[in-house]
Amino acid sequence: MSFNHREIEKKWQEYWEKNKTFKTVDDDDKPKFYVLDMFPYPSGAGLHVGHPEGYTATDILARMKRMQGYNVLHPMGWDAFGLPAEQYALDTGNDPAEFTEKNINTFRRQIKSLGFSYDWDREINTTDPNYYKWTQWIFLKLYEKGLAYMDEVPVNWCPALGTVLANEEVIDGKSERGGHPVIRKPMKQWLLRITAYADRLLEDLEELDWPESVKEMQRNWIGRSEGAEIRFEVDGHDETFTVFTTRPDTLFGATYTVLAPEHPLVEKITTPEQKAAVEAYLDAIKSKSDLERTDLAKEKTGVFTGAYAIHPVTGEKLPIWIADYVLMSYGTGAIMAVPAHDERDYEFAKKFNLPIKEVVAGGDIAKEAYTGDGEHINSDFLNGLNKEEAIKKMIEWLEANGKGQKKVTYRLRDWLFSRQRYWGEPIPIIHWEDGTMTPVPEEELPLKLPKTDKIKPTGTGESPLANIEEWVNVVDPKTGKKGRRETNTMPQWAGSCWYYLRYIDPHNDKQLADPEKLKKWLPVDVYIGGAEHAVLHLLYARFWHKFLYDIGVVPTKEPFQKLFNQGMILGENNEKMSKSRGNVVNPDDIIESHGADTLRLYEMFMGPLEASIAWSTKGLDGARRFLDRVWRLFVDENGNLNPKIVDNPETDTLERVYHQTVKKVTEDYEALRFNTAISQLMVFINEAYKAPVLPKEYMEGFVKLLSPVCPHIGEELWEKLGHNNTIAYEPWPTYDESKLVEEEVEIVVQVNGKVRAKLRVPADISKEKLEQLAMEDEKIKEHIAGKTVRKVITVPGKLVNIVAN
């Protein structure tokens, strides 16, 4: 007999909703546990089976911790600004707000149907003005402290789409959507000074319980390098340029220099003879993205400017080239080229026939650049020194002679914070006709997005908000001065930078959150989500959190103490699930056919949480069969409790396996090893089927252990066991170490490596006694009759191997 999942799941979901079973109360004395999911972007496609994998993992933790006596904060909300909704609005003429609301309703219904124990009274939505009021407030604080500023920066401008695109949205010089040409052009944009926090973002990673791979990605993204800045004069011009290098020790090997095509000197120093060639080159590379330009596999291109730089030590003239592999946005936009000891410079020098001068011994520069350490040669006062010594000595020389200094640089750039889009948070700044700008006063927040049907991009590089005259134009009531509101909106990252703080106090209209509540709940204890957010979201959220710490809003330096990335669920054919491949599995269908508990159990049992694993309908059926077996063990044909379940039986049946199960399941849940915990639950059920009676205490303990994974069947069986309250706050089972020990063990006896007998013996038997019992066994006697026993190998608790011939 199997159970009716539709009836049971509906019954308990209604019960939890009606009784607000999972409402979190702030003022209690229990220890806190804050477990967080990366909140989803509510797309038109709805939830897919990948979402519940992470959500089930956090739900198991939340449910177990409640039963262990913790006060648990486990919330859900919506990261609802973003390009797809705007694109939909452009394609259909419908309001993105309506589209978003409809999608959120679908997501909420789907998530509730999976039985997650969220406190829905704390639900947030980044597009709600009561929420983005505080996103805007944080922006104003950043502006006040000089961390939000405007600057001319080269951006990816797509004339056809009439907007600026992020680097991720440009592929091979064309827009990801529609394949339109993209060019680089300078435009005034808002930036946030994340670079001011580079060192702290780097150093504080050490204190976090995060996957090493994610920490490493953040370290690389921040990209701290130590070296020197060196000044070069331009021959015949009153101009200088600066290069940054991590290898100032190789300065004597510099044979030419390279400027980025966008470098302001290019125009000033190019000779008349080279002008046409330089202009043609600049035109040819205009549409390339930074990623493409720095691709190591691509062939190097460049052009000579006709001008020369003066070597700061030797006074030699070094030709100045321009090449697209040097980026204006990285370092100083200029490099000194040392082809003998740098692979890219070597390739470039070979292609354009430029001199290659060896200054570090140890390689064969006729074949390739030598990038290792070695003794310095052809280097005047550095000769004979190794790399470390030579770097130190060269920096001392540069500083003493006013030609350069020690310098630390970062790969990290300031964060480009404006989007020429409608569907985002308005930036609360007013630009006045006299060229000044002022922030919108705090008491006027939120500055709301106006409702409009004019969502088409303007084509001027401004957002569609520029079309809405009555919103854009303002007059200062005191002075009569005219102004225009900032028309750029914030990127989707803004709302997700701080959402975990708002869950703590979601209805506060006086402040971002009550400081006492923040002190109680921060930091987040466990944060689970996809690895695709390893760098940007997590880095931006850490930056905002550190800023809020500096201005006294939050009490901790870091937002997320432990981070875990779940793997991906692939299609049955091991490919990524996608609409175009037609291999997407919809959770609604599975809940209908197999039930939410089965889906939750299957996704946790598929394999390790961090692994990417293919979906299997067979595996799903297996999960359902296990739950049917559990049901039949507890409930008889008539729907009553199995009469084998009794209070205080006179036997220690199931005692050892029960205590082992409590220990293993508890430890595995804590460590997010859900697949092995479920295996142990299966072991217990197999043993229980063999038992003559079922002690009620153990059966109740089993239901408690199962309930975080399969909460609906957990509640139903708890009720069948005679309880009329929810299982959600029942105390978590405990185990007794002394009951884990096996009294008897099975020993394998081998003759010449082949198994010939098995013995049940006391677990604490001595080695001598064990060997004696093995030799006296009838089957063993047969196999060694007439042979000489050469040696006996005994592994206590495991085996005896008799070598005889």
Curated annotation (Swiss-Prot):
Reaction(s) catalysed by this chain's protein: tRNA(Leu) + L-leucine + ATP = L-leucyl-tRNA(Leu) + AMP + diphosphate
EC number: 6.1.1.4
Residues noted as binding ATP in the record, renumbered to the chain: 579
Segments carrying motif 'HIGH' region: 40-51
Enzyme class: ligase
Residue span of motif 'KMSKS' region: 576-580
Record keywords: Aminoacyl-tRNA synthetase, ATP-binding, Cytoplasm, Ligase, Nucleotide-binding, Protein biosynthesis
Subcellular location(s) per record: Cytoplasm
Metal-binding among keywords: no
Cited PROSITE patterns: AA_TRNA_LIGASE_I
Main localisation: cytoplasm
Gene Ontology biological process: leucyl-tRNA aminoacylation
Superkingdom to which the source organism belongs: Bacteria
Keyword Coiled coil: no
Pfam families noted in UniProt: Anticodon_1 (PF08264), tRNA-synt_1 (PF00133), tRNA-synt_1_2 (PF13603), tRNA-synt_1g (PF09334)
GO annotation, cellular component aspect: cytosol
Similarity comment: family membership: Belongs to the class-I aminoacyl-tRNA synthetase family.
Protein name (Swiss-Prot/TrEMBL): Leucine--tRNA ligase
Species name: Geobacillus sp. (strain WCH70)
